[in-house]
Amino acid sequence: MPTASSKDDEVDLLIDAWSQLLPEVDLTPLDVMSRLRRAAFHLSKLRAKAFASAGIAVWEFDVLAVLRRAGTELSATRLITATMIGSAAMTNRLDKLAERGLVHRRPNPSDGRAILVAITPEGIDRVDAAMTELVRLEADALRDVSRADQALLASALRVLAAGETHEA
């Protein structure tokens, strides 16, 4: 087993071990994706912390943020599309958000079977506080990465995210 130097991290050790077991395999993708997965795990924890500081859960932020960015009321169908969750889950989430006074629902006058959802002033306060704290925490997490490297990383991740349709 390789010995960790001061610059080695868990991914370096993983790559070293696999390169000994499979020397003919280019492990560059594993190196990149393992670091990306670890970064995503840390980002998930940052998001939960930021949202908790504003008194909302991650799922609440997701719905409230869509409404906040829209700047107007949206149909439940539009919220389902934007958040990529099912209709039963959305109904449950909207019930809970309405109970907490974070959204208001009303019948859609042009379609009696549908509802329109609007974010309340309390919902705006919560989602704005959560976003402000999230950006602060993310900036702190990126403090050792130069602006130039952040731009390169964002560019590379944009390409990677667009590649989600290139499944093997």
Protein language model regions, located:
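Short, locally clustered residues in the helix-turn-helix/winged-helix DNA-binding domain
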Residues: R37, A65-G71, R158
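Exposed, interaction-prone assembly regions rather than primary DNA-binding/catalytic cores
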Residues: A151-A168
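Charged, amphipathic alpha-helical coiled-coil/dimerization segments
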Residues: D95-S155
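Short alpha-helical "packing" element that flanks the helix-turn-helix/winged-helix DNA-binding module
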Residues: E60-L64
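N-terminal leader segment of winged-helix/HTH proteins
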Residues: M1-A54
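Short amphipathic alpha-helical segments with heptad-repeat character
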Residues: L30-M33, R37, F41, M84, ...
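DNA-binding alpha-helical recognition surfaces that contact promoter or target DNA
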Residues: A65, N92, S155
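Canonical helix-turn-helix DNA-binding module
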Residues: A57-V58, G71-L116
